[in-house]
Swiss-Prot record:
InterPro entries: A-crystallin/Hsp20_dom, HSP14.7/HSP23.5/HSP23.6-like, HSP20-like_chaperone. Belongs to the small heat shock protein (HSP20) family. May form oligomeric structures. It comes from Arabidopsis thaliana. Residues 145-165 are annotated as: Disordered. Residues 100-210 form the sHSP domain. Its main location: mitochondrion. It holds the Pfam family HSP20. Disulfide bonds: none annotated. This is 23.6 kDa heat shock protein, mitochondrial. PROSITE patterns: SHSP. CDD domains: ACD_sHsps-like (cd06464). One of its GO terms (cellular component) is mitochondrion. It comes from the Eukaryota.
Length: 210
């Protein structure tokens, strides 16, 4: 009897660690290519518009807009963001947990797709035109913002600085990514991404009917 009990304890102790290891969740990571960036900055443009120029930047990962820009964190496609907005409108509880009022009124960001273009609006209170940078990394629109926290008053490089980064994927066969326009005014960033007409798309081929 004693030997059977000891054998049972030995078997249970050898099996338990393996079962716990099976339940351990897997960790995945995703890297983004930031070579040959086409970026929008404030050089050579009057007013609040953002002009286009080319540069190369080192690979860098920043914090996402966890408060006002969560729908685009991490990188999402346009269709995913539009589907997410549909869910917000249909589910008031989900809207409230993602920075939208229970009535469905959007707060902090908005995105609309029309026949001619995709219209994106992001509220960035406390940030100026010089604090915001837009870039195209391959087919991904990257929005970065950096500004000082007035409450902390820290110097550059200290914890008083706020840094934000968020991304949205743009298919180059649907949108004219070389004609993106951006405007920053009164703490609101507006981005217009023109769409290609059907006859301009090289992935659409008309088939002749005999």
């Amino acid at each position: 009897m004693a030997s059977a009990l000891a054998l049972k304890r030995l078997l249970s102790s050898s099996i338990a660690p393996r079962s716990r290891s099976v339940l351990r969740p897997a960790v995945s990571s995703r890297l983004f290519n930031t070579n040959a960036v086409r970026s929008y900055d404030d050089d050579g443009e009057n007013g609040d518009g953002v002009d286009l120029y080319r540069r190369s930047v080192p690979r860098r990962r920043g914090d996402f807009f966890s408060d006002v820009f969560d729908p685009f964190s991490p990188t999402r496609s346009v269709s995913q963001v539009l589907n997410l907005m549909d869910q917000f409108m249909e589910n008031p509880l989900l809207s409230a947990t993602r920075g939208m009022g229970a009535s469905g009124a959007r707060r902090g960001w908005d995105i609309k797709e029309k026949d001619d273009a995709l219209y994106l609006r992001i509220d960035m209170p406390g940030l100026s035109r010089e604090d915001v940078k837009l870039a195209l990394e391959q087919d991904t629109l990257v929005i970065r913002g950096e500004g000082k926290n007035e409450e902390d008053g820290g110097e550059e490089g200290e914890s008083g600085n706020r840094r934000f980064t968020s991304r949205i994927g743009l298919p180059d066969k649907i949108y004219k990514i070389d004609e993106i326009k951006a405007e920053m005014k009164n703490g609101v960033l507006k981005v217009v991404i023109p769409k290609m007409k059907e006859q301009e798309r090289n992935d659409v081929r008309q088939i002749e009917i005999n």
